[in-house]
UniProtKB/Swiss-Prot annotation:
Binding site for Zn(2+): 373, 375, 442
Cofactor note: Binds 1 zinc ion per subunit.
GO molecular function per UniProt: metal ion binding; protein farnesyltransferase activity
Cofactor: Zn(2+)
Protein name, as recorded: Protein farnesyltransferase subunit beta
Native source species: Pyricularia oryzae (strain 70-15 / ATCC MYA-4617 / FGSC 8958)
InterPro entries: FTB, PGGT1B-like, Prenyltrans, Terpenoid_cyclase/PrenylTrfase
Enzyme Commission number(s): 2.5.1.58
Region Disordered: start-end pairs: 1-56
Substrates-to-products reaction catalysed: L-cysteinyl-[protein] + (2E,6E)-farnesyl diphosphate = S-(2E,6E)-farnesyl-L-cysteinyl-[protein] + diphosphate
Amino acid sequence: MRHHTKNLRRRAIFLRTTPRGNMDSSSSVATSTSSSSNHRLVRSSEGSPSAGGDDIEEVIMTPGIATGRVQPAVSVAIPDLFTQLPPVKDDLATSTSKTQDETVAICLPYLAGSDANADVEHNAHGVPHIDRKKHVRFLRNMLRQLPAPFIAADASRPWFLYWSLNAMAILGENVKEDYAESLADTARSMQNESGGFSGGHGQTSHLATTYAVVLALAVVGDEEGLSLIDRRALWKWLCDLKEADGGFRMSLGGEEDVRGAYCAAVIISLLNLPLDLCKDSEAYIRDPTANLFTGLGDYVRKCQTFEGGISGQPDAEAHGAYAFCALGCLSLLGTPSETIPKYLNIERLISWLSSRQYAPEGGFSGRTNKLVDGCYSHWVGGCWPLIEACLNGPVKVSSLDVEPQPLFSREGLMRYILCCCQEQGKRGGLRDKPGKPSDAYHSCYVLSGLSSAQNRWQLVVGDDDMPAWMVSPFPNEEEIFDEKDRVGTVHPVYVIPEDKVAKVQTFFASRDGF
């Protein structure tokens, strides 16, 4: 019964209205409240690396939380679903349920437009505008010299390049003009003669950092930067990472997981690398008939758990980021409508993904019984276009105007992103949730999730009968965001601006050999 009621709570996100009845005033969500004053929670981000700006965030708890409802600060059209507690709640109190209640209490004022920052302008739907200028300034700072605590993230430097550049590109910045030369110099220092890119000069090549460098170079789109990639050495290195069970190790002698499957598939397809195995690789010696994609779908299949989600490795816990990696990988192995149901139980996966969206927050969690987090706007939110392509199959151009049947609450996700994930102080950037500091990682994936929620992706069959991804606004649907708050379109598999994917693939397809 306990699990049953929890699932009801999570699925409440799909309801458009909920009862207005008074909730128990002793609810653990409530802090000390009175009818005459607001109450302030001060949360410190001490201990988290900061690139400057506000490290203390004030969250105003408005009267009404004790009754399960927060009154909007202005008269706007905000559905009850996002301003009050869910109608179904498990009576059993645990440490997990308490932190969930605390998270709801922090998010509700932002969702209701009654948060502390009176300078934040809301539109007619009670949603703040995207503060592009402030977010871009924050992201540019993330590409400058960082404070001393960031030394702990030295091996992740390629990720800071990708996260920051991609987020700026999504916001409409021309990153090529300002960063092409410096990015090429930095990437060159990270490349090893044995193939692949490391976290920095003299470090070991890793599939995750290689993925990040390749995507950063793709986002900037400078041909000189793309040309510095040693594709032959990279191909041979990938052959050495190929395992007998079909998967890829993240580094030589390192771990094997579904991240490797996705990262390898992205790199191979984006850079037009041969699928043939290098003849002196162990993978070729084991099976001369195999190639880099042989058995990859079967490896992904083994990572689906009893819940329906995808784990990093077989027999581990399902996680939202691994679900995206699995779906992205399978979408590169063939048409999603063929490859995804071939290797995954799609009904169970949809059930698990649906359970990740919470009410009243509207955002996604990454695991069962975990909190919402802005980064899962992409890791889970980005799964839905791939799921829809799996269910609908490639469509004819004449079918593009068919009214889509949503599999998740787009409105809920966009409200969480715009209301709760924007750092509303002078710091800028995007974040996990109110009370957490903004960072490059969350800025990238929150904006990617926003792009996915704002646009409809479909696989379309053209005259050549070859399916291609096509993006368009959702038809016949009033949006809760103003048009000036629309961000750039992000490719549903490669997670970089869609136009960059075509340019990079065309560039490498035009090159003979390596």
